[in-house]
Amino acid sequence: MANRLAGKVALITGGASGLGAAQAKRFAEEGAKVVIGDLNEEMAKGVVAEIRAAGGDALFIRLDVTDAASWNNAIAAAVEAFGGLTTLSNTAGIIHPGGFEEESIEGWNKMVAVNQTAIFLGIKAAIPELVKSGNGSIINISSLIGMFPTAGNASYCATKAAVRIMSKAAALEFVDRGVRVNTIVPGGMNTPITANVPPDVLKQQTSQIPMGKLGDPIDIANGALFLASDEAKYITGVDLPIDGGWSVGV
């Protein structure tokens, strides 16, 4: 099936690499106009160039997801370029290990700002345009350890759990205004962020995956594509695990 996102305009945070870049390319393949919001201009423009070379339509907007003014500018730029906004994918995120004794308040606050508060800011900034579209979709990226926490990841577990509950609250708040809000819950993934996971932790996580391997960014992109499409018009407030069966065995 082609052009599953024809007529859609999608803003994807963290779109310069990893899960966000995979979504940007996949969305464009299916006809969406894509806005990549990121701080890494060089990598983001590389993704934009790939999309355009393949015949898609995309642009880069510098976006600091922790800053409300930056969000407002990004939404305005998307509307100016493409006439509106139908889809928001909150994919930007960070991770660093640290239990309750090791984690600093600075590290905690940074994790909360990027992984949690940024999603609040994004929803707040985008919702007027999403409502105006008449068929808006918000996709927030959580993590399996936001459902099943692990020791030694205090701030990451907390922020990714918050993403799930915040998504459900938003789903209820905007359901009668034509905006769906869903969460993707990735298991272990082959992404740049995985490089920050200690090898012993990564090995342990992989051993718990029934499929016996990490997922790839395209797996998340295909899930996000479905949730962004009209095929998911009756789906809101759900957690969609994409984890190789990991959550089944937890």
Curated annotation (Swiss-Prot):
Alphabetical list of PANTHER family matching this protein: OXIDOREDUCTASE, SHORT-CHAIN DEHYDROGENASE/REDUCTASE FAMILY (AFU_ORTHOLOGUE AFUA_5G02870) (PTHR43639), SHORT-CHAIN DEHYDROGENASE_REDUCTASE FAMILY PROTEIN (PTHR43639:SF1)
EC number(s) per entry: 1.1.1.-
Source organism phylogeny: Bacteria, Pseudomonadati, Pseudomonadota, Alphaproteobacteria, Sphingomonadales
Alphabetical list of InterPro entries matching this protein: NAD(P)-bd_dom_sf, Sc_DH/Rdtase_CS, SDR_fam
Gene designation per UniProt: linX
GO MF terms held by the record: 2,5-dichloro-2,5-cyclohexadiene-1,4-diol dehydrogenase activity
Key words, A-Z: NAD, Oxidoreductase, Plasmid
Catalytic reactions of this protein: 2,5-dichlorocyclohexa-2,5-dien-1,4-diol + NAD(+) = 2,5-dichlorohydroquinone + NADH + H(+)
Gene3D superfamilies listed in its UniProt record: NAD(P)-binding Rossmann-like Domain
Annotated function: Catalyzes the degradation of 2,5-dichloro-2,5-cyclohexadiene-1,4-diol (2,5-DDOL) into 2,5-dichlorohydroquinone (2,5-DCHQ) in vitro. LinX appears not to be involved in gamma-hexachlorocyclohexane (gamma-HCH) degradation pathway, in contrast to LinC which has the same enzymatic activity.
Cross-referenced Pfam families: adh_short_C2
Protein name in UniProt: 2,5-dichloro-2,5-cyclohexadiene-1,4-diol dehydrogenase LinX
PROSITE patterns (alphabetical): ADH_SHORT
Active site annotation, chain numbering: Y156
Binding residues for NAD(+): D38, D64, V65, Y156, K160, T191, T194
Homology family: Belongs to the short-chain dehydrogenases/reductases (SDR) family.
